[in-house]
UniProtKB/Swiss-Prot annotation:
It holds the Pfam family Helicase_C. The modification Phosphothreonine is found at T54. GO terms for biological process: chromatin remodeling; chromosome separation; DNA double-strand break processing; positive regulation of transcription by RNA polymerase II; regulation of DNA recombination. Binds to DNA preferentially in the vicinity of transcriptional start sites. Interacts with MSH2 and TRIM28. Part of a complex composed of TRIM28, HDAC1, HDAC2 and EHMT2. Interacts with PCNA. The lineage of its organism: Eukaryota, Metazoa, Chordata, Craniata, Vertebrata. There is a cross-link at K77, K333, K469, K722, K994 (Glycyl lysine isopeptide (Lys-Gly) (interchain with G-Cter in SUMO2)). ATP binds at residues 519-527, 895-902. Residues 7-19 have a biased composition (Basic and acidic residues). The gene is Smarcad1. It catalyses: ATP + H2O = ADP + phosphate + H(+). This is SWI/SNF-related matrix-associated actin-dependent regulator of chromatin subfamily A containing DEAD/H box 1. Keywords: Acetylation, ATP-binding, Chromatin regulator, Chromosome, DNA damage, DNA repair, DNA-binding, Helicase, Hydrolase, Isopeptide bond, Nucleotide-binding, Nucleus, Phosphoprotein, Repeat, Ubl conjugation. One of its GO terms (cellular component) is nucleoplasm.
Length: 1024
């Protein structure tokens, strides 16, 4: 029996039963309930009709003598008639959750007794006769008006029958239908059934014996209190009960209406969805439609539902699989933070894992939400062995994965080894201060998380084997898997061989219903491969619409490339101000625009609720995300918003799939294949979130993690590097320039370091630690990024002189001084150049050029200019670019500049100007704005004035030059201030790059064996 009905029919009173129970009573915890009237003065002698809060499976089969006999018709009618005429006595039983007297019990029999003539049995819901006499006709008309037609009445009747069958499984449908026909409400039908059949559960149950005569007297007092209740209160409670019944009928009608649209899901599932949306039909319908389209679970159309009867359909998924996926889908919404009205989490994502298709039936698939902290829990022998083996052999890194196990505790566990048996383990763990038995039970969590990852690995391995088998089979048959360049592409342009392999790989994963990550190294033409794939889909009849989400700096390049390579595709640019986007949305909704592809930016896609709503409602076929590493954080708001885009398939394009750790890679996989990974995100987060270490410091476990990650990503990612596919591409040479700081700069850096070192012990927040690191980085780059030369005395003088300026004549000098205090030396220098009265406070050129990196950079630029090379110069800081402009002007070098403040419309013109005007020597770029999707192959030297904490941002910058179309050898120069924090940053970056190498290196196969790499197989199949 479901909990909804279980809680509605619970009774509060207890009293004595004339016969002792044959079985010991078992207490049950009270739950919330709604009021219903059903009592009599002699109820204690008759036995209480009660329900235990247990599932149906726990209720024993009902015996013949376990029911309370129905009173004679004449007595029952006389009682009700008396109540209708006088309406002076009405008894209500309080079923509130505060009652502590309710204690349903199981028993074998209930003694049969006849109701006395004085007994009055009153239910809160009126019978049909009572309704016809006492209730106004308007009420009946309102009740009937809630059901729109006869089919809805029949469906409601079916719902009532189903509910009664759950409560009274031993009764026939005909008996239950008679009760439904004889009453007008659900509560009335159940109350009548309780009177006629007795215990609803179908199992022999008895009232619990009162422990003392005081309990009986208390019940009698409660009865008297109830009998004396004022008529107004009784009517109010009766109205509340009727209203509750009416609400239930409304809700059931909504459930039935929703089930017509989604015949695959049972009513209980739909009820829970409606609860999620506050019983709002339209919102629940929209949510389920989005889910159904995403899952290919079809909903019933108008033609498929006739006369309220569901028509059977062929489904792509089984009913159980659809339920599980719906649970996973809905359980994700509160995590994404969109369902703000939600009060409680109906679905448990952990339980979804337990019920998923990966469940092997072993203990490894059980829910992780169980409580393992109880030392009295009986552990299975299999888990005992696993836990013992884990604690015996695990490394410190593995032990720290145990909940509440710190590094120190892990070290203590290692010192306690060996653990020969289970008893020894408990004894040793209990004796050591700081350790407890809880750590032993918590090991089960780690083991289960490993099992989840192993199941994912096995699933991914099966997918990979299927792809490999198909390509191998096609190759063996001589047909091969070779999709030629689509005819829609510009015939004057041709795909390179490795790009054809990429196109074939995209077509292969699409055929198998998978999503993928095209992770070719920067500069190999991922944009062109994606456009070719859209052209292939167009030829196959899939004309969209598709969505391409790109960084703002590359939107012009994408529009240009699509128009160049495949002019047949109609492209709609969703970009501009809020008003412009509003007009575009209006055109889309009213179908004024004819388009196959929508191109937009990450910001425009999710910046407002209207933007997000558009892409939730649009039925997109493919959503392509350029620079997909922007989705590396599954906890970010951007990630959560983009997950709501309603696209049947997803494709990520990224040149750097692995950046800081394996968790970022798993975030990308979860984004493209949410139905496979979303139910396991917590396990994935814990297993792959640890920091990387150098190869010589990696434990066996850390190497296993890398192997596991490689196994999981194998079917979904295609990664080629330039050295593999571009034999003719000129080489790239890396050069590290250690720059000695100037004498003054070294003094300032040392003083800053000592000051920060003294205060670092008081810092607790990571944000403050990051600020310390940033201050050191700025000083290592240039002293003018701090305020050193403009002392407080100078600033006071300058603030007074500023009053002579026409724009500041009425200003407050104290406020001017406060503003100047937070400015850097270079900002104050620019301010002095701007205002005449403080012009004399400008810094000398020697101070501006007083930097160790500037001295080295000046020499390098002079040499490169003599050779005829052209330079792309990157910096993390826009203010550093300002100072670099002074340097370039001082040495009379022509340059262009592009940073985050440059308008999107101007960027493409600056790039074209640099690529066509060979007299421009230097292109100044900020690493973030100029490191994505820009082609600068006309330059052959890349200088990184200051490196990024993320080496892949630097790699993106490097590959602006080292890409397809480059004809010269590319030189990459990194400027590192010697003896500063930048040396440590360089070392950490090298470790991160090693992780990518470990992940992308293909394991060497045995000699003569078939290569397992899909790309290699495709290449062989295509004869390349």
């Amino acid at each position: 029996m479901n909990l909804f009905n279980l809680d509605r029919f619970r009774f509060e009173k207890r009293s004595k039963i004339e016969e002792a129970p044959e079985a010991a009573p078992q207490p049950s915890q009270p739950g919330p309930s709604s009021p219903i009237s059903l009592s009599a003065e002699e109820e204690n002698a008759e036995g209480e009709v009660s329900r235990a809060n247990t599932p149906d499976s726990d209720v024993t089969e009902k015996t013949e003598d376990s029911s309370v006999p129905e009173p004679p018709d004449n007595e029952s009618k006389a009682s009700l008639s008396c109540f209708q005429n006088q309406r002076t006595i009405q008894e209500y039983i309080d079923l509130s959750s505060d009652s502590e007297d309710v204690s349903p019990n199981c028993s074998s029999t209930v003694q049969e007794k006849k109701f006395s003539k004085d007994t009055v049995i009153i239910v809160s819901e009126p019978s049909e006769d009572e309704e016809s006499h006492d209730l106004p006709s308007a009420t009946r008309r309102n009740d009937i008006s809630e059901l729109e037609d006869l089919s809805e009445l029949e469906d409601l009747k079916d719902a009532k029958l189903q509910t009664l069958k759950e409560l009274f499984p031993q009764r026939s449908d005909s008996d239950l239908l008679k009760l439904i026909d004889s009453t007008s409400t659900m509560d009335g039908a159940i109350a009548a059934a309780l009177l006629k059949f007795g215990d609803a559960g179908g199992g022999p149950r008895k009232r619990k014996l009162s422990s003392s005569s005081e309990a009986y007297e208390e019940d009698e007092a409660n009865d008297d209190q109830s009998l004396k209740k004022p008529r107004g209160d009784r009517r109010e409670e009766s109205n509340e009960s009727a209203e509750a019944s009416s609400n239930w009928e409304k809700q059931e009608s909504i459930v039935l209406k929703l089930q017509k649209e989604f015949p695959n899901f049972d009513k209980q599932e739909l009820r829970e969805v409606l609860k999620e949306h506050e019983w709002m039909y339209t919102e629940a319908l929209e949510s389920l439609k989005v889910f159904a389209e995403d899952q290919d679970v079809q909903c019933a159309s108008q033609s498929e539902v006739t006369n309220g009867k569901e028509v059977a359909r062929n489904q792509n998924y089984s009913k159980n699989a659809a339920k599980i996926k719906m649970k996973q889908k809905i359980s994700m919404k509160p995590q994404n933070g969109f369902n703000k009205k939600r009060k409680k989490n109906v679905f448990n994502p952990k339980k979804a894992v337990e019920d998923s298709e990966y469940d092997s039936g072993s203990d490894a698939g059980s829910s992780l939400d169980e409580d393992y902290s109880s030392c009295e829990e009986v552990m299975e022998d299999g888990y005992k062995g696993k836990i013992l083996h884990f604690l015996q052999d695990a490394s410190i890194g593995e032990l720290t994965l145990i909940p509440k196990c710190s590094q120190k505790k892990a070290q203590k566990i290692i010192e306690l080894r060996p653990f020969n048996n289970w008893e020894t383990l408990f004894t040793k763990m209990s004796k050591i201060n700081g350790l407890s038995e809880d750590l032993i039970w918590n090991c089960k969590t780690v083991i289960q998380e490993r099992d989840v990852v192993i199941r994912l690995m096995n699933k991914c391995e099966d997918i990979s084997n299927k792809l490999t088998k198909q390509v191998t089979m096609l190759t063996g048959n001589g047909g091969g898997w070779n999709i030629e360049q689509p005819s829609l592409l510009n015939q004057s342009l041709s795909l390179k061989p490795y790009q054809k392999v990429g196109l074939n790989w995209l077509a292969l994963v699409h055929k198998h219903g998978l999503n993928g990550i095209l992770a070719d190294e920067m500069g190999l033409g991922k944009t062109i491969q994606a456009i070719a794939f859209l052209a292939y889909l167009f030829q196959e009849g899939n004309k969209g619409p598709h969505l391409i989400v790109v960084p703002a700096s590359t939107i012009d390049n994408w529009l240009r490339e699509v128009n160049l390579w495949c002019p047949t595709l109609n492209v709609l640019c969703y970009y501009g101000s809020q008003e412009e986007r509003k007009q575009i949305r209006f055109n889309i909704h009213n179908k004024y625009e004819d388009y196959n592809v929508i191109v937009t930016t990450y910001n425009c896609a999710i910046s407002s609720s209207d933007d997000r709503s558009l892409f939730r409602r649009l039925k997109l076929n493919y959503a392509i995300f350029d620079e997909g590493h922007m989705l590396k954080n599954m906890g970010s708001i951007r990630y959560q918003h983009l997950m709501t885009i309603n696209a049947r398939n997803r494709l990520l394009l990224t040149g750097t799939p692995v950046q800081n750790n394996l968790l970022e890679l798993m975030s990308l996989l979860n984004f493209v294949m949410p139905h496979m990974f979303s139910s396991s995100t917590s396990e994935i987060r814990r297993m792959f979130s640890s920091k990387t270490k150098p190869a010589d410091e990696q434990s066996i476990y850390e190497k296993e993690r890398i192997a596991h990650a490689k196994q999981i990503i194998k079917p979904f990612i295609l990664r080629r590097v330039k050295e593999e596919v571009l034999k003719l591409l000129p080489p790239k040479k890396d050069q590290i320039e250690l720059c000695a700081m100037s004498e003054k700069q070294e003094q300032l850096y040392s003083g800053l370091f000592n000051r920060l070192k003294k205060s670092i012990n008081n810092l607790e927040k990571n944000t403050e630690m990051c600020n310390v690191m940033m201050q050191l980085r700025k000083m290592a780059n240039h002293p003018l990024l701090h305020r050193q030369y403009y002392t407080a005395e100078k600033l006071k003088e300058m603030s007074q002189l500023m009053l002579k300026e026409p724009t500041h004549c009425e200003a407050n000098p104290d406020l001017i001084f406060e503003d100047m205090e937070v400015m850097t030396d270079f900002e104050l220098h620019v301010l002095c150049k701007q205002y005449q009265h403080i012009n004399s406070y400008q810094l000398d050129m020697d101070l501006i050029l007083d930097s160790g990196k500037f001295r080295t950079l000046g020499c390098i630029l002079s040499e490169l200019k003599q050779k005829g090379d052209r330079v792309v110069l990157f910096s993390q800081f826009t203010m550093m670019l300002d100072i670099l402009e002074v340097l370039l002007k001082h040495h009379q070098h022509r340059y262009l500049r592009l940073d985050g403040k440059t308008q999107i419309s101007e960027r493409i013109h600056l790039i074209d100007e640099f690529n066509t005007d060979m007299d421009i020597f230097v292109f100044l770029l900020s690493t973030k704005a100029g490191g994505l999707g820009i082609n600068l192959t006309s330059a052959n030297v890349v200088i990184l004035h200051d490196i990024d904490c993320n080496p892949y941002n630097d790699k993106q910058a490097e590959d602006r030059c080292h890409r397809v179309g480059q004809t010269k050898e590319v030189l990459v120069i990194k400027l590192i201030s010697q003896g500063t924090i930048e040396e440590s940053m360089l070392k950490i970056n090298q470790q991160k790059l090693k992780l990518e190498q470990d992940m992308t290196t293909v394991d060497e196969a045995d000699e003569g064996s078939m290569p397992a790499d899909i790309a290699t197989l495709l290449k062989t199949s295509m004869g390349l």
